[in-house]
Curated annotation (Swiss-Prot):
Reaction catalysed by this enzyme: GTP + H2O = GDP + phosphate + H(+)
Membrane topology annotation: Peripheral membrane protein
Organism: Chlorobium luteolum (strain DSM 273 / BCRC 81028 / 2530)
Name of the protein in its database record: Elongation factor 4
Cellular component annotations (GO), alphabetically ordered: plasma membrane
Subcellular location, record wording: Cell inner membrane
UniProt-annotated binding residues for GTP: 21-26, 139-142
C-alpha cells in the first residue's frame, strides 16, 4: 500500500452508531454547525440529515445519508470530513454494514440516561468486523438523570478500552463537540492512498431523482473516477456514462474528479435504482478491476403481507404508488395477487416489521392510499412427498396436507438487553413464542444480555410491543437470520357459513392452532356485523373444524300484528320467515369489515 498523499492523509471518513433516540442525528447537526457546513439560520429543522417526515417523527434514520464537511483543526490544518449517517434499525442491518464498509472510523454514541442497548451492540459488532476505529461518545451528559460513570463502565466492559478514551458530550447543548472533532482527526485513520490502482468504488446507497434517474452514493476505494468516463457495475454487468460526479455537502456539488478515499455521488442516467444495488462495486468499463469489493449480497425480503386498496377502483393507483416507492427503496418487492375476499391487490415483501410499517405509512401519507393489510407472514419451505421444495409466502398457496412431507420455517438468533428484574417476564414471553433460550451475560450488576433463538414467524406480529410492555420499556432487542428448521406447522382456515375467507388464513404451529382458532372465532364474532340470517364462524385445519362461534340473526317480530288468535296463523308466519332466512343464507354474502383483518394482529389483547 502506498503511503498516504498529502490530500488523502487529510480525509477522514466516519459514521455514527447509536440506538434509536440516543441523539445521533442531533450530534450530526452539531458537527455540521461547527464545521460551518450549515449555520443556525439554515437549520430550520432539527435533525437535518433525517429529511423524511417519518424519519423525524419516529426518531429513526431510514436511508443512509452522506455529507462532506471542511474543518480547520486547532493546529491550523485543513481536513475533509465525510460523515455517513446510517440507519440504526435491525431491518436495515445490511445497509448499515455497507455504510460501515465505506468508513475508517465510527463514533459509538450511547445515551447517558439509557446505557448500552441491543441495536448499539449489534451495529458495534458490524463495525468491529469491518475493522473500524471506534470512538466511544457518551451523550446527554447534561440531563439530571444521566449516569455517566455507570455507562462508561458498560462501554469499557463491552470493548475493553481505557476510561480516558471515552468522550463526553451533550449534542443538544453543544458541550464537548470541539473535543470530539479533534478526536476524529487524531484517532480515525486516513484512507489508504490507492489512486494508482484500477477503479473500485463501493455503493452504499442510492436515491431516485425524477429528472436525473438514480443518484448513486459511493466511496472510492481504489483508483480515480473522472466525469465523462464509462463505468461498469459488477452485479449486473451494465455499462453507463458518468454524466456527473461530485461530493455531497447538504446539496450536490459537482466535481471533475473523485479519487481514492473520497465519498461522493455518481449520476449516469440509471432508470431504475434496482440497477444500483447497495454493496455493489463500480469500476471502469475499459480497464475494469479484476475482483469486486467483498461483502456484496442480494437482500432478500423476510416478511410478506398482502396490500389491498379499500376501494377496488384504486388498484392502478396502488400500483403506481408502489412503483414510485420502489424507485427509492430497492428492497421492496411486490407482485400482483387476487383474493376472493379482498379483490385485486399486491403481495409485498419487506425486510422486517419496521420496514413494513414505514411502507404502509408512506403509502397512506404521501400517496393518500386507503389500504387493507393482511396478516404479515414469513416465507416457508414446504418439502413435498415427491421430494420437490415449494416456497410459500402466502397461506392460501399452502399445498394439500396429504402431499406434504414436512415444513421448514426461518429462525433468528436474538439478543435482548434488559434490567435483571425483568428476566422472569422475558423468559416467560420467550417460552410462549416457542423461543429456545441459550444464555445470559451480565453487562453490569443491573443489566443483562439474554440470547434466544426464535422462529421468525413468532416475532413478526407484536413481539417488540409485548417486550416493551413487560419490561416497562427497558428492554431492547436485535436479531439476525440463522437459517431454516423443520417445524410442525399447519394451515388454519376461517370459514364464514362454510365459505373459506382466504385473506384470514394463517400458518401456525400445531400446538397453538386450537388456541388461535378459538380466540380468532371469538374476536370475529364481536367484529362482523349481524346479518338477517345466522352466520357460522368456524376455524378449521384441513377438513377438521376445531372451533365455532355463531352470530345470531337479526329478526323482525312477525307476530307483532297478531293480537291473540289462532296458533296455526302464528306458526305459518314464523315458517314463512324461516324460509326467507334460509333463502337469504344461500344467496347472501357476509361482508368482512377491515377490522376483521386487523383482529388477527392483536389477537392476544
Amino acid at each position: 500500500m502506498a503511503p498516504s498523499s498529502p490530500e488523502v492523509s487529510r480525509i477522514r471518513n466516519f459514521c455514527i452508531i447509536a440506538h434509536i433516540d440516543h441523539g445521533k442525528s442531533t450530534l450530526a447537526d452539531r458537527l455540521l454547525e461547527m464545521t460551518h457546513t450549515l449555520d443556525r439560520t439554515q437549520m430550520d429543522s432539527a435533525q437535518v440529515l433525517d429529511d423524511m417526515d417519518l424519519e423525524r417523527e419516529r426518531g429513526i434514520t431510514i436511508k443512509s445519508h452522506a455529507v462532506q464537511m471542511k474543518y480547520c483543526s486547532v493546529a491550523g490544518d485543513d481536513y475533509t470530513l465525510n460523515l455517513i449517517d446510517t440507519p440504526g434499525h435491525v431491518d436495515f442491518s445490511y445497509e448499515v454494514s455497507r455504510s460501515l464498509a465505506a468508513c475508517e472510523g465510527a463514533l459509538l454514541v450511547v445515551d447517558a440516561t439509557q446505557g448500552v442497548e441491543a441495536q448499539t451492540i449489534a451495529n458495534l459488532y458490524l463495525a468491529i468486523e469491518a475493522g473500524l476505529e471506534i470512538i466511544p461518545v457518551i451523550n446527554k451528559i447534561d440531563l439530571p438523570s444521566s449516569d455517566v460513570e455507570g455507562v462508561a463502565r458498560q462501554i469499557i466492559d463491552l470493548i475493553g478500552i481505557e476510561r480516558e478514551e471515552i468522550l463526553q458530550v451533550s449534542a443538544k447543548a453543544g458541550l464537548g463537540v470541539a473535543e470530539l472533532m479533534e478526536a476524529i482527526i487524531a484517532r480515525v485513520p486516513a484512507p489508504a492512498d490507492n489512486r494508482k490502482q484500477p477503479l473500485r468504488a463501493l455503493i452504499f446507497d442510492s436515491v431516485f431523482d425524477p429528472y436525473r434517474g438514480a443518484v448513486v452514493y459511493l466511496r472510492i476505494v481504489d483508483g480515480v473516477l473522472r466525469r465523462g468516463e464509462k463505468v461498469r457495475f459488477f452485479a449486473n454487468d451494465k455499462i453507463f456514462l458518468a454524466d456527473e460526479i461530485g461530493t455531497m455537502a447538504l446539496k450536490r456539488q459537482p466535481k471533475e474528479v473523485l479519487e481514492a478515499g473520497d465519498v461522493g455521488y455518481l449520476i449516469c442516467s440509471i432508470k431504475d435504482v434496482k440497477d444500483a444495488k447497495v454493496g455493489d462495486t463500480v469500476t471502469h468499463a475499459e480497464v475494469p478491476a479484476e475482483k469486486r469489493l467483498a461483502g456484496y449480497k442480494d437482500v432478500k425480503p423476510m416478511v410478506f403481507s398482502g396490500l389491498y386498496p379499500v376501494n377496488s377502483n384504486e388498484f392502478e393507483d396502488l400500483r403506481e404508488s408502489l412503483e414510485k416507492l420502489s424507485l427509492n427503496d430497492a428492497s421492496l418487492v411486490y407482485t400482483p395477487e387476487t383474493s376472493v375476499a379482498l379483490g385485486f391487490g399486491f403481495r409485498c415483501g419487506f425486510l422486517g416489521l419496521l420496514h413494513m410499517e414505514i411502507i404502509q405509512e408512506r403509502l397512506e401519507r404521501e400517496y393518500d392510499m386507503n389500504i387493507i393489510t393482511t396478516v404479515p407472514n414469513v416465507e416457508y419451505r414446504v418439502i413435498m412427498t415427491n421430494g420437490e421444495t415449494v416456497i410459500v409466502d402466502n397461506p392460501s398457496k399452502m399445498p394439500d396436507t396429504t402431499r406434504i412431507a414436512h415444513v421448514e420455517e426461518p429462525y433468528v438468533s436474538m439478543q435482548i438487553i434488559t434490567l435483571a428484574d425483568y428476566i422472569g417476564n422475558i423468559m416467560k414471553l420467550g417460552m410462549e413464542r416457542r423461543g429456545e433460550y441459550r444464555n445470559t451475560d451480565y453487562l453490569d450488576t443491573q443489566r443483562v444480555n439474554m440470547h434466544f433463538e426464535f422462529p421468525l414467524a413468532e416475532i413478526v406480529f407484536d413481539f417488540h410491543d409485548r417486550l416493551k410492555s413487560i419490561s416497562k420499556g427497558y428492554a431492547s432487542m436485535d436479531y439476525e437470520y440463522i437459517g431454516y428448521r423443520e417445524s410442525d406447522l399447519v394451515k388454519l382456515d376461517v370459514l364464514l357459513n362454510a365459505e373459506p375467507v382466504d385473506a384470514l388464513s394463517i400458518i401456525v404451529h400445531r400446538s397453538k392452532a386450537y388456541d388461535w382458532g378459538r380466540k380468532l372465532c371469538g374476536k370475529l364474532k364481536g367484529i362482523i356485523p349481524k346479518q338477517m340470517y345466522e352466520v357460522a364462524i368456524q376455524a378449521a385445519i384441513g377438513s377438521r373444524i376445531i372451533s365455532r362461534e355463531t352470530i345470531s340473526a337479526m329478526r323482525k317480530n312477525v307476530l307483532a300484528k297478531c293480537y291473540g288468535g289462532d296458533i296455526s296463523r302464528k306458526r305459518k308466519l314464523l315458517e314463512k320467515q324461516k324460509e326467507g332466512k334460509k333463502r337469504m343464507k344461500q344467496v347472501g354474502r357476509v361482508e368482512v369489515p377491515q377490522e376483521a383483518f386487523l383482529a388477527i394482529l392483536n389477537i392476544d389483547e
